[in-house]
Amino acid sequence: MPDRPDMAAAVAAPPLTNLIRSGGEMFNWTDTDGRDNQLLTRLVLEHAGPGRTVLVAGPHPDGLVAALAGAGAEVTWLLRSLIDAETAARAHPGITVLSGAFGKADLTGGYDLVVAAGGIQRLNSAEGDQLAAGELLDRLAAAVRPDGALILMHDNQLGAHHTVRLDPGARHRDDAAWHPSETTEGPAARSQLTAHLTGAGLVVDAAYAAFPEPGDPAVLIGGVTLGDVTSPLRPWLRTVLAQAYTVAFRGRPVLSDPRRLVNRALRAGAEETVAGGWLVVAHAPGDTEPAREWHDVLVSDVHGVYTPDAAEPGVTGRVDSLVRERIVNPVAADRLEDRLLELCAAADVRRLRQEIAQYESWLGAGPVSGPRALADLSDLGITADGPVVMSARWSPAEPVPAQIVLVRALWQFAVRLITWGRPHPWPNTASAADLAAILAGMAGRSLADDELRAAIDLQVVIDSAEFGLGPAERQAHRLALLAVQPGTAPLDVAGYHELTEALWRQRYQASHLLAMMEWNEQIIRSRDSALSKMDWELQLLRRTWGGRSLMLAKRAYKKVKK
Protein backbone atom coordinates (compact mmCIF):
# COMPACT_ATOMS: atom_id res chain seq x y z
CA MET A 1 0.00 0.00 0.00
CA PRO A 2 1.29 3.52 -0.72
CA ASP A 3 2.13 5.99 1.99
CA ARG A 4 -0.53 8.45 3.11
CA PRO A 5 -0.58 11.38 0.63
CA ASP A 6 0.51 14.86 1.66
CA MET A 7 -2.77 16.80 1.75
CA ALA A 8 -1.08 20.21 1.67
CA ALA A 9 0.90 19.26 -1.41
CA ALA A 10 -2.23 17.82 -3.02
CA VAL A 11 -4.17 21.07 -2.49
CA ALA A 12 -1.31 23.23 -3.78
CA ALA A 13 -0.78 21.09 -6.90
CA PRO A 14 -2.13 22.55 -10.17
CA PRO A 15 -5.30 20.94 -11.56
CA LEU A 16 -4.90 18.06 -13.98
CA THR A 17 -6.98 18.92 -17.02
CA ASN A 18 -6.21 15.61 -18.74
CA LEU A 19 -7.49 13.45 -15.85
CA ILE A 20 -11.07 12.17 -15.91
CA ARG A 21 -12.53 10.30 -12.93
CA SER A 22 -15.08 7.85 -14.25
CA GLY A 23 -16.04 6.36 -10.87
CA GLY A 24 -14.97 3.36 -8.88
CA GLU A 25 -11.37 4.50 -8.60
CA MET A 26 -9.23 3.06 -5.81
CA PHE A 27 -7.87 5.86 -3.63
CA ASN A 28 -5.15 4.57 -1.29
CA TRP A 29 -3.83 2.05 -3.79
CA THR A 30 -1.19 1.68 -6.49
CA ASP A 31 -0.37 -1.01 -9.05
CA THR A 32 3.09 -2.03 -10.16
CA ASP A 33 3.49 -1.36 -13.86
CA GLY A 34 6.42 -3.69 -14.55
CA ARG A 35 9.34 -2.89 -16.80
CA ASP A 36 9.46 -1.96 -20.46
CA ASN A 37 9.25 -4.89 -22.85
CA GLN A 38 10.72 -4.61 -26.34
CA LEU A 39 8.51 -7.32 -27.79
CA LEU A 40 5.20 -5.85 -26.63
CA THR A 41 6.27 -2.32 -27.55
CA ARG A 42 7.12 -3.39 -31.09
CA LEU A 43 3.81 -5.19 -31.63
CA VAL A 44 1.81 -2.27 -30.27
CA LEU A 45 3.67 0.37 -32.29
CA GLU A 46 3.08 -1.61 -35.49
CA HIS A 47 -0.66 -0.98 -35.04
CA ALA A 48 -0.36 2.63 -33.88
CA GLY A 49 0.34 5.73 -35.88
CA PRO A 50 -0.38 9.44 -36.20
CA GLY A 51 -4.02 10.25 -35.57
CA ARG A 52 -5.05 6.76 -34.46
CA THR A 53 -6.96 6.54 -31.20
CA VAL A 54 -5.52 4.10 -28.67
CA LEU A 55 -6.99 2.80 -25.41
CA VAL A 56 -4.43 1.41 -22.98
CA ALA A 57 -6.49 -0.63 -20.52
CA GLY A 58 -4.90 -1.25 -17.14
CA PRO A 59 -1.39 -0.78 -15.75
CA HIS A 60 1.35 -0.88 -18.40
CA PRO A 61 5.01 0.13 -18.48
CA ASP A 62 5.41 3.88 -18.74
CA GLY A 63 7.74 3.47 -21.73
CA LEU A 64 4.99 1.80 -23.78
CA VAL A 65 2.61 4.71 -23.28
CA ALA A 66 5.36 7.22 -24.02
CA ALA A 67 6.20 5.37 -27.25
CA LEU A 68 2.56 5.48 -28.35
CA ALA A 69 2.34 9.20 -27.67
CA GLY A 70 5.64 9.74 -29.45
CA ALA A 71 4.25 7.95 -32.52
CA GLY A 72 1.51 10.56 -32.80
CA ALA A 73 -1.36 8.45 -31.50
CA GLU A 74 -4.22 9.89 -29.42
CA VAL A 75 -3.77 7.86 -26.25
CA THR A 76 -6.31 7.23 -23.51
CA TRP A 77 -4.98 5.40 -20.47
CA LEU A 78 -7.42 3.71 -18.08
CA LEU A 79 -6.16 3.06 -14.53
CA ARG A 80 -8.10 1.90 -11.49
CA SER A 81 -5.72 3.58 -9.02
CA LEU A 82 -6.27 7.31 -8.52
CA ILE A 83 -2.68 7.78 -7.35
CA ASP A 84 -1.36 6.06 -10.48
CA ALA A 85 -3.73 8.07 -12.67
CA GLU A 86 -2.58 11.39 -11.20
CA THR A 87 1.07 10.39 -11.65
CA ALA A 88 0.42 9.36 -15.26
CA ALA A 89 -1.47 12.57 -16.02
CA ARG A 90 1.43 14.68 -14.75
CA ALA A 91 4.05 12.62 -16.59
CA HIS A 92 2.10 12.59 -19.89
CA PRO A 93 0.19 15.85 -20.30
CA GLY A 94 -0.56 15.03 -23.92
CA ILE A 95 -2.67 11.94 -23.19
CA THR A 96 -6.06 11.46 -21.56
CA VAL A 97 -6.08 9.50 -18.32
CA LEU A 98 -9.24 7.78 -17.07
CA SER A 99 -9.34 6.80 -13.41
CA GLY A 100 -11.89 4.27 -12.24
CA ALA A 101 -13.30 0.82 -12.69
CA PHE A 102 -13.29 -0.62 -16.18
CA GLY A 103 -17.01 -1.30 -15.99
CA LYS A 104 -17.83 2.38 -15.38
CA ALA A 105 -15.63 3.89 -18.10
CA ASP A 106 -17.44 5.33 -21.11
CA LEU A 107 -15.99 3.50 -24.11
CA THR A 108 -18.91 3.94 -26.50
CA GLY A 109 -16.89 6.01 -28.97
CA GLY A 110 -14.54 3.13 -29.67
CA TYR A 111 -10.84 3.12 -30.46
CA ASP A 112 -8.65 2.19 -33.40
CA LEU A 113 -6.41 0.18 -31.09
CA VAL A 114 -7.16 -1.37 -27.70
CA VAL A 115 -4.12 -2.55 -25.74
CA ALA A 116 -4.53 -4.87 -22.75
CA ALA A 117 -1.03 -6.32 -22.62
CA GLY A 118 -1.23 -6.40 -18.82
CA GLY A 119 -4.14 -8.83 -18.93
CA ILE A 120 -7.63 -8.43 -17.53
CA GLN A 121 -6.79 -9.22 -13.90
CA ARG A 122 -6.20 -5.57 -12.96
CA LEU A 123 -9.16 -3.98 -14.73
CA ASN A 124 -11.67 -4.52 -11.93
CA SER A 125 -11.70 -2.17 -8.96
CA ALA A 126 -12.37 -2.98 -5.33
CA GLU A 127 -14.62 0.11 -5.26
CA GLY A 128 -16.86 -1.07 -8.09
CA ASP A 129 -18.70 -4.07 -9.44
CA GLN A 130 -16.57 -7.13 -10.05
CA LEU A 131 -17.04 -8.02 -13.70
CA ALA A 132 -16.47 -11.61 -14.71
CA ALA A 133 -13.63 -12.46 -17.07
CA GLY A 134 -16.05 -12.99 -19.94
CA GLU A 135 -17.65 -9.57 -19.37
CA LEU A 136 -14.24 -7.89 -19.32
CA LEU A 137 -13.31 -9.54 -22.61
CA ASP A 138 -16.64 -8.53 -24.15
CA ARG A 139 -16.16 -4.88 -23.14
CA LEU A 140 -12.63 -4.88 -24.57
CA ALA A 141 -13.93 -6.32 -27.85
CA ALA A 142 -16.79 -3.82 -27.96
CA ALA A 143 -14.34 -0.93 -27.57
CA VAL A 144 -12.66 -1.78 -30.89
CA ARG A 145 -13.86 0.24 -33.87
CA PRO A 146 -14.41 -1.40 -37.26
CA ASP A 147 -11.01 -2.08 -38.82
CA GLY A 148 -9.49 -1.50 -35.37
CA ALA A 149 -7.29 -3.95 -33.50
CA LEU A 150 -7.10 -5.54 -30.06
CA ILE A 151 -3.82 -6.68 -28.50
CA LEU A 152 -4.53 -8.79 -25.44
CA MET A 153 -2.30 -10.80 -23.12
CA HIS A 154 -4.03 -13.46 -21.02
CA ASP A 155 -2.37 -15.23 -18.12
CA ASN A 156 -2.13 -19.04 -18.23
CA GLN A 157 -2.90 -20.48 -14.80
CA LEU A 158 -1.26 -23.76 -15.88
CA GLY A 159 1.90 -22.01 -17.03
CA ALA A 160 5.34 -23.02 -15.90
CA HIS A 161 5.76 -19.73 -14.03
CA HIS A 162 2.83 -20.68 -11.76
CA THR A 163 3.78 -24.35 -11.51
CA VAL A 164 7.30 -23.70 -10.21
CA ARG A 165 6.44 -20.68 -8.05
CA LEU A 166 7.89 -20.91 -4.54
CA ASP A 167 6.66 -17.85 -2.68
CA PRO A 168 5.14 -18.85 0.68
CA GLY A 169 2.99 -16.20 2.30
CA ALA A 170 2.44 -14.23 -0.89
CA ARG A 171 -1.32 -14.20 -0.34
CA HIS A 172 -0.84 -12.38 2.96
CA ARG A 173 2.19 -10.30 2.02
CA ASP A 174 1.21 -9.02 -1.43
CA ASP A 175 -1.50 -6.34 -1.41
CA ALA A 176 -2.44 -7.15 -5.00
CA ALA A 177 -3.49 -10.67 -3.94
CA TRP A 178 -6.92 -9.48 -2.75
CA HIS A 179 -8.38 -11.04 -5.90
CA PRO A 180 -8.43 -14.88 -5.91
CA SER A 181 -5.81 -16.27 -8.27
CA GLU A 182 -7.44 -19.71 -8.59
CA THR A 183 -10.44 -18.47 -10.51
CA THR A 184 -12.73 -20.86 -12.37
CA GLU A 185 -14.02 -18.19 -14.73
CA GLY A 186 -12.70 -17.06 -18.05
CA PRO A 187 -10.68 -18.81 -20.74
CA ALA A 188 -8.26 -21.45 -19.44
CA ALA A 189 -6.69 -22.31 -22.81
CA ARG A 190 -5.61 -20.48 -25.94
CA SER A 191 -8.38 -22.07 -27.98
CA GLN A 192 -10.98 -20.94 -25.41
CA LEU A 193 -9.63 -17.39 -25.51
CA THR A 194 -9.72 -17.15 -29.30
CA ALA A 195 -13.19 -18.73 -29.38
CA HIS A 196 -14.51 -16.15 -26.91
CA LEU A 197 -13.09 -13.23 -28.89
CA THR A 198 -14.51 -14.69 -32.10
CA GLY A 199 -17.90 -14.96 -30.43
CA ALA A 200 -17.57 -11.31 -29.39
CA GLY A 201 -17.36 -10.29 -33.06
CA LEU A 202 -13.60 -10.07 -33.59
CA VAL A 203 -11.42 -11.82 -36.14
CA VAL A 204 -8.30 -13.36 -34.62
CA ASP A 205 -5.22 -12.57 -36.70
CA ALA A 206 -2.56 -14.20 -34.51
CA ALA A 207 -2.58 -16.16 -31.28
CA TYR A 208 0.82 -16.68 -29.68
CA ALA A 209 2.04 -18.68 -26.73
CA ALA A 210 4.13 -16.25 -24.67
CA PHE A 211 7.21 -17.25 -22.66
CA PRO A 212 8.41 -17.09 -19.95
CA GLU A 213 5.93 -14.80 -18.14
CA PRO A 214 2.96 -12.81 -19.43
CA GLY A 215 4.17 -9.59 -17.83
CA ASP A 216 7.56 -9.71 -19.56
CA PRO A 217 7.46 -12.03 -22.60
CA ALA A 218 10.68 -12.77 -24.45
CA VAL A 219 9.53 -15.48 -26.90
CA LEU A 220 6.28 -15.72 -28.86
CA ILE A 221 5.42 -18.95 -30.69
CA GLY A 222 2.36 -19.29 -32.90
CA GLY A 223 1.16 -20.33 -36.31
CA VAL A 224 2.13 -23.74 -37.63
CA THR A 225 5.28 -23.82 -35.50
CA LEU A 226 3.33 -24.04 -32.24
CA GLY A 227 3.05 -27.70 -31.28
CA ASP A 228 4.80 -28.98 -34.42
CA VAL A 229 7.43 -31.47 -33.24
CA THR A 230 8.65 -31.96 -36.81
CA SER A 231 9.52 -28.29 -37.26
CA PRO A 232 13.20 -27.65 -38.02
CA LEU A 233 13.04 -24.84 -35.46
CA ARG A 234 12.73 -27.25 -32.51
CA PRO A 235 16.44 -27.51 -31.55
CA TRP A 236 16.88 -23.76 -31.93
CA LEU A 237 13.73 -23.06 -29.90
CA ARG A 238 15.05 -25.19 -27.05
CA THR A 239 18.13 -22.99 -26.85
CA VAL A 240 16.13 -19.76 -27.12
CA LEU A 241 13.59 -20.77 -24.48
CA ALA A 242 16.30 -21.99 -22.12
CA GLN A 243 18.01 -18.62 -22.37
CA ALA A 244 14.74 -16.75 -21.82
CA TYR A 245 13.91 -18.72 -18.68
CA THR A 246 17.47 -18.36 -17.40
CA VAL A 247 17.22 -14.58 -17.64
CA ALA A 248 13.74 -14.48 -16.09
CA PHE A 249 14.31 -16.85 -13.17
CA ARG A 250 17.97 -16.28 -12.40
CA GLY A 251 18.40 -15.99 -8.63
CA ARG A 252 14.65 -16.42 -7.93
CA PRO A 253 13.40 -19.12 -5.54
CA VAL A 254 11.40 -21.71 -7.48
CA LEU A 255 10.01 -25.13 -6.76
CA SER A 256 11.90 -26.68 -9.67
CA ASP A 257 13.91 -25.51 -12.66
CA PRO A 258 11.28 -24.36 -15.20
CA ARG A 259 13.68 -25.04 -18.08
CA ARG A 260 13.28 -28.79 -17.60
CA LEU A 261 9.50 -28.58 -17.70
CA VAL A 262 9.47 -26.36 -20.79
CA ASN A 263 12.06 -28.53 -22.53
CA ARG A 264 9.94 -31.65 -22.01
CA ALA A 265 6.84 -29.83 -23.19
CA LEU A 266 8.66 -28.62 -26.29
CA ARG A 267 9.77 -32.15 -27.14
CA ALA A 268 6.18 -33.35 -26.76
CA GLY A 269 4.69 -30.47 -28.74
CA ALA A 270 2.82 -29.27 -25.64
CA GLU A 271 4.56 -25.92 -25.12
CA GLU A 272 1.23 -24.12 -25.44
CA THR A 273 0.05 -25.83 -22.23
CA VAL A 274 2.93 -24.55 -20.08
CA ALA A 275 3.29 -21.12 -21.71
CA GLY A 276 3.26 -18.11 -19.44
CA GLY A 277 0.30 -16.63 -21.28
CA TRP A 278 -1.35 -16.17 -24.65
CA LEU A 279 -0.98 -13.04 -26.72
CA VAL A 280 -3.86 -12.52 -29.14
CA VAL A 281 -4.02 -9.93 -31.92
CA ALA A 282 -7.52 -9.51 -33.35
CA HIS A 283 -9.40 -6.95 -35.42
CA ALA A 284 -12.99 -5.87 -35.79
CA PRO A 285 -14.42 -6.47 -39.29
CA GLY A 286 -14.76 -3.34 -41.39
CA ASP A 287 -14.43 -2.05 -44.90
CA THR A 288 -10.83 -3.21 -45.36
CA GLU A 289 -9.16 -6.42 -44.31
CA PRO A 290 -5.65 -6.15 -42.85
CA ALA A 291 -3.15 -7.50 -45.35
CA ARG A 292 -0.31 -8.71 -43.20
CA GLU A 293 1.72 -11.87 -42.70
CA TRP A 294 2.38 -12.80 -39.10
CA HIS A 295 5.63 -14.42 -38.08
CA ASP A 296 5.38 -17.77 -36.34
CA VAL A 297 8.14 -16.91 -33.88
CA LEU A 298 9.23 -13.60 -32.35
CA VAL A 299 12.16 -13.39 -29.94
CA SER A 300 13.48 -10.57 -27.78
CA ASP A 301 16.93 -10.53 -26.15
CA VAL A 302 19.53 -8.01 -25.02
CA HIS A 303 20.04 -6.95 -28.65
CA GLY A 304 16.42 -6.33 -29.63
CA VAL A 305 13.54 -8.14 -31.34
CA TYR A 306 14.05 -10.57 -34.20
CA THR A 307 12.52 -13.52 -36.05
CA PRO A 308 14.26 -16.73 -37.12
CA ASP A 309 13.31 -16.36 -40.77
CA ALA A 310 14.28 -12.70 -41.15
CA ALA A 311 16.82 -11.69 -38.56
CA GLU A 312 17.04 -7.94 -38.28
CA PRO A 313 20.11 -6.04 -37.10
CA GLY A 314 20.02 -5.55 -33.35
CA VAL A 315 21.76 -3.12 -31.08
CA THR A 316 25.41 -2.75 -32.06
CA GLY A 317 28.36 -1.79 -29.94
CA ARG A 318 30.73 -3.26 -27.40
CA VAL A 319 30.31 -4.41 -23.82
CA ASP A 320 33.64 -4.89 -22.07
CA SER A 321 35.65 -7.07 -24.47
CA LEU A 322 32.58 -8.38 -26.33
CA VAL A 323 30.83 -7.22 -29.48
CA ARG A 324 27.06 -7.49 -29.83
CA GLU A 325 26.17 -9.87 -32.64
CA ARG A 326 23.17 -11.89 -33.63
CA ILE A 327 23.32 -15.29 -35.30
CA VAL A 328 20.03 -17.03 -36.09
CA ASN A 329 20.56 -20.27 -37.95
CA PRO A 330 17.85 -22.82 -37.11
CA VAL A 331 18.75 -26.17 -38.59
CA ALA A 332 17.04 -29.54 -38.41
CA ALA A 333 19.73 -31.13 -36.26
CA ASP A 334 20.43 -32.27 -32.75
CA ARG A 335 22.22 -29.98 -30.38
CA LEU A 336 25.79 -30.96 -29.61
CA GLU A 337 25.17 -30.65 -25.88
CA ASP A 338 22.24 -33.09 -26.03
CA ARG A 339 24.36 -35.58 -27.97
CA LEU A 340 27.14 -35.41 -25.38
CA LEU A 341 24.68 -35.75 -22.50
CA GLU A 342 23.25 -38.91 -24.05
CA LEU A 343 26.71 -40.39 -24.60
CA CYS A 344 27.71 -39.60 -21.02
CA ALA A 345 24.56 -41.24 -19.69
CA ALA A 346 25.30 -44.35 -21.78
CA ALA A 347 28.99 -44.30 -20.72
CA ASP A 348 29.90 -44.54 -24.42
CA VAL A 349 33.43 -43.23 -24.01
CA ARG A 350 34.50 -44.13 -27.55
CA ARG A 351 31.80 -42.09 -29.28
CA LEU A 352 32.17 -39.33 -26.71
CA ARG A 353 35.84 -39.08 -27.63
CA GLN A 354 34.91 -38.92 -31.31
CA GLU A 355 32.40 -36.09 -30.81
CA ILE A 356 34.80 -34.02 -28.70
CA ALA A 357 37.64 -34.61 -31.16
CA GLN A 358 35.39 -33.49 -34.03
CA TYR A 359 34.49 -30.33 -32.12
CA GLU A 360 38.18 -29.67 -31.40
CA SER A 361 39.09 -30.06 -35.08
CA TRP A 362 36.18 -27.76 -36.04
CA LEU A 363 37.65 -25.01 -33.86
CA GLY A 364 41.02 -25.31 -35.57
CA ALA A 365 44.49 -24.67 -34.24
CA GLY A 366 44.76 -20.89 -34.53
CA PRO A 367 42.93 -18.12 -32.68
CA VAL A 368 39.14 -18.31 -33.03
CA SER A 369 37.10 -15.23 -33.91
CA GLY A 370 33.45 -14.57 -34.55
CA PRO A 371 30.42 -16.11 -32.84
CA ARG A 372 31.82 -19.64 -32.68
CA ALA A 373 34.49 -18.46 -30.24
CA LEU A 374 31.81 -17.84 -27.59
CA ALA A 375 29.13 -20.31 -28.65
CA ASP A 376 28.09 -22.80 -25.97
CA LEU A 377 27.69 -26.46 -26.81
CA SER A 378 23.94 -25.84 -26.51
CA ASP A 379 24.23 -23.24 -29.30
CA LEU A 380 25.80 -25.72 -31.72
CA GLY A 381 23.87 -28.04 -34.00
CA ILE A 382 25.11 -31.30 -35.47
CA THR A 383 24.91 -31.68 -39.23
CA ALA A 384 26.47 -34.01 -41.77
CA ASP A 385 29.13 -31.37 -42.45
CA GLY A 386 30.01 -30.94 -38.78
CA PRO A 387 28.94 -28.50 -36.06
CA VAL A 388 27.17 -25.26 -36.97
CA VAL A 389 26.34 -22.24 -34.81
CA MET A 390 22.55 -22.09 -34.45
CA SER A 391 22.34 -19.14 -32.09
CA ALA A 392 24.79 -16.55 -30.81
CA ARG A 393 24.52 -13.16 -29.15
CA TRP A 394 28.15 -12.15 -28.66
CA SER A 395 31.50 -12.21 -30.42
CA PRO A 396 34.92 -11.44 -28.96
CA ALA A 397 36.43 -8.10 -29.83
CA GLU A 398 39.77 -9.88 -30.29
CA PRO A 399 40.38 -13.48 -31.42
CA VAL A 400 40.51 -16.02 -28.58
CA PRO A 401 43.09 -18.85 -28.52
CA ALA A 402 41.56 -22.13 -29.61
CA GLN A 403 42.73 -23.81 -26.40
CA ILE A 404 40.80 -21.30 -24.27
CA VAL A 405 37.69 -21.73 -26.44
CA LEU A 406 37.88 -25.51 -26.08
CA VAL A 407 38.53 -25.38 -22.34
CA ARG A 408 35.63 -22.98 -21.72
CA ALA A 409 33.16 -25.09 -23.69
CA LEU A 410 34.21 -28.37 -22.05
CA TRP A 411 34.43 -26.83 -18.59
CA GLN A 412 30.94 -25.35 -18.96
CA PHE A 413 29.67 -28.76 -20.05
CA ALA A 414 31.35 -30.31 -17.00
CA VAL A 415 29.65 -27.75 -14.76
CA ARG A 416 26.26 -28.67 -16.20
CA LEU A 417 26.95 -32.38 -15.78
CA ILE A 418 27.70 -31.83 -12.10
CA THR A 419 25.13 -29.20 -11.15
CA TRP A 420 22.31 -30.86 -13.09
CA GLY A 421 23.16 -34.22 -11.55
CA ARG A 422 23.48 -35.89 -14.95
CA PRO A 423 25.14 -39.33 -15.12
CA HIS A 424 28.59 -39.63 -16.65
CA PRO A 425 31.42 -42.22 -16.68
CA TRP A 426 33.54 -40.42 -14.03
CA PRO A 427 31.34 -39.97 -10.94
CA ASN A 428 34.32 -39.84 -8.55
CA THR A 429 35.88 -36.69 -9.99
CA ALA A 430 36.60 -34.13 -7.30
CA SER A 431 35.54 -30.98 -9.18
CA ALA A 432 34.39 -29.53 -12.48
CA ALA A 433 38.02 -28.69 -13.26
CA ASP A 434 39.02 -32.37 -12.96
CA LEU A 435 36.13 -33.44 -15.17
CA ALA A 436 37.03 -30.75 -17.72
CA ALA A 437 40.62 -32.04 -17.74
CA ILE A 438 39.35 -35.54 -18.57
CA LEU A 439 37.17 -34.20 -21.39
CA ALA A 440 40.04 -32.11 -22.75
CA GLY A 441 42.25 -35.20 -22.69
CA MET A 442 39.78 -36.89 -25.03
CA ALA A 443 40.66 -34.23 -27.58
CA GLY A 444 44.36 -34.83 -27.03
CA ARG A 445 44.78 -31.61 -25.06
CA SER A 446 46.13 -31.01 -21.58
CA LEU A 447 44.58 -28.54 -19.17
CA ALA A 448 46.75 -26.09 -17.24
CA ASP A 449 45.53 -24.05 -14.28
CA ASP A 450 46.13 -20.72 -16.01
CA GLU A 451 44.13 -21.88 -19.05
CA LEU A 452 41.22 -22.90 -16.83
CA ARG A 453 41.23 -19.56 -15.03
CA ALA A 454 41.35 -17.70 -18.34
CA ALA A 455 38.36 -19.73 -19.57
CA ILE A 456 36.41 -19.00 -16.38
CA ASP A 457 37.24 -15.29 -16.62
CA LEU A 458 35.90 -15.32 -20.18
CA GLN A 459 32.69 -16.96 -18.96
CA VAL A 460 32.32 -14.31 -16.26
CA VAL A 461 32.66 -11.58 -18.91
CA ILE A 462 29.93 -13.21 -21.01
CA ASP A 463 27.57 -13.64 -18.05
CA SER A 464 28.21 -10.06 -16.94
CA ALA A 465 27.23 -8.73 -20.36
CA GLU A 466 24.22 -11.03 -20.56
CA PHE A 467 22.80 -10.40 -17.09
CA GLY A 468 24.25 -6.98 -16.25
CA LEU A 469 26.37 -8.06 -13.28
CA GLY A 470 28.16 -5.44 -11.21
CA PRO A 471 31.76 -5.70 -9.93
CA ALA A 472 30.77 -7.36 -6.65
CA GLU A 473 28.43 -9.76 -8.43
CA ARG A 474 31.15 -10.62 -10.92
CA GLN A 475 33.58 -11.56 -8.17
CA ALA A 476 30.99 -13.65 -6.34
CA HIS A 477 30.03 -15.35 -9.60
CA ARG A 478 33.68 -16.10 -10.41
CA LEU A 479 34.28 -17.66 -6.99
CA ALA A 480 31.12 -19.75 -7.36
CA LEU A 481 32.28 -21.05 -10.75
CA LEU A 482 35.68 -21.98 -9.37
CA ALA A 483 34.11 -23.92 -6.49
CA VAL A 484 31.87 -26.24 -8.53
CA GLN A 485 32.21 -29.82 -7.29
CA PRO A 486 29.92 -32.85 -6.86
CA GLY A 487 26.99 -31.73 -4.73
CA THR A 488 26.94 -28.14 -6.02
CA ALA A 489 23.48 -26.85 -6.90
CA PRO A 490 22.83 -25.07 -10.23
CA LEU A 491 24.36 -21.60 -10.20
CA ASP A 492 21.70 -19.78 -12.21
CA VAL A 493 18.26 -21.23 -11.43
CA ALA A 494 18.42 -23.27 -8.23
CA GLY A 495 14.99 -24.69 -7.48
CA TYR A 496 13.95 -26.55 -4.36
CA HIS A 497 14.04 -29.81 -6.30
CA GLU A 498 17.57 -29.12 -7.54
CA LEU A 499 18.72 -28.10 -4.06
CA THR A 500 17.29 -31.34 -2.67
CA GLU A 501 19.13 -33.30 -5.36
CA ALA A 502 22.36 -31.44 -4.53
CA LEU A 503 21.89 -32.21 -0.82
CA TRP A 504 21.37 -35.88 -1.63
CA ARG A 505 24.54 -35.93 -3.72
CA GLN A 506 26.48 -34.32 -0.88
CA ARG A 507 25.17 -36.92 1.55
CA TYR A 508 26.02 -39.67 -0.91
CA GLN A 509 29.55 -38.34 -1.28
CA ALA A 510 29.91 -38.12 2.51
CA SER A 511 28.59 -41.66 3.01
CA HIS A 512 30.90 -42.90 0.25
CA LEU A 513 33.90 -41.29 1.94
CA LEU A 514 32.89 -42.77 5.30
CA ALA A 515 32.55 -46.21 3.71
CA MET A 516 35.99 -45.82 2.13
CA MET A 517 37.47 -44.82 5.49
CA GLU A 518 35.87 -47.82 7.17
CA TRP A 519 37.16 -50.14 4.45
CA ASN A 520 40.67 -48.71 4.79
CA GLU A 521 40.56 -49.20 8.55
CA GLN A 522 39.47 -52.81 8.08
CA ILE A 523 42.33 -53.43 5.65
CA ILE A 524 44.82 -51.85 8.06
CA ARG A 525 43.52 -53.93 10.97
CA SER A 526 43.68 -57.15 8.97
CA ARG A 527 47.24 -56.42 7.86
CA ASP A 528 48.27 -55.51 11.40
CA SER A 529 46.80 -58.79 12.59
CA ALA A 530 48.70 -60.74 9.92
CA LEU A 531 51.95 -58.95 10.74
CA SER A 532 51.45 -59.58 14.46
CA LYS A 533 50.87 -63.26 13.81
CA MET A 534 54.00 -63.52 11.67
CA ASP A 535 56.02 -61.66 14.31
CA TRP A 536 54.72 -64.04 17.02
CA GLU A 537 55.71 -67.07 14.94
CA LEU A 538 59.15 -65.58 14.29
CA GLN A 539 59.74 -64.91 17.99
CA LEU A 540 58.58 -68.43 18.82
CA LEU A 541 61.04 -69.93 16.38
CA ARG A 542 63.86 -67.87 17.82
CA ARG A 543 63.20 -69.17 21.33
CA THR A 544 63.40 -72.92 20.39
CA TRP A 545 66.57 -75.00 19.64
CA GLY A 546 65.26 -75.88 16.24
CA GLY A 547 64.61 -72.24 15.42
CA ARG A 548 68.03 -71.20 16.65
CA SER A 549 69.66 -73.88 14.49
CA LEU A 550 67.84 -72.57 11.45
CA MET A 551 68.94 -69.00 12.19
CA LEU A 552 72.59 -70.10 12.60
CA ALA A 553 72.43 -72.06 9.36
CA LYS A 554 71.00 -69.00 7.60
CA ARG A 555 73.80 -66.77 8.87
CA ALA A 556 76.45 -69.33 7.87
CA TYR A 557 74.95 -69.61 4.40
CA LYS A 558 75.12 -65.83 3.95
CA LYS A 559 78.78 -65.74 5.00
CA VAL A 560 79.74 -68.58 2.66
CA LYS A 561 77.85 -66.95 -0.19
CA LYS A 562 79.76 -63.70 0.28
Spans of features found by a protein language model:
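Conserved alpha-helix/loop element of class I SAM-dependent methyltransferases that forms part
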Residues: 22-25, 30-53
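Catalytic activation segment of kinase domains across protein kinase-like and atypical kinase folds
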Residues: 169, 175-182, 367-425
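A short glycine-rich, Lys/Arg-flanked "PGG" loop and its adjoining helix->strand segment in the class I
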Residues: 128-149
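Boundary detector for helix-to-coil junctions that initiate low-complexity/charged tails
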Residues: 465-562
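Short alpha-helix
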Residues: 182-209
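C-terminal lobe and adjacent flexible extensions of AdoMet/dcAdoMet transferase-like proteins
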Residues: 220-324
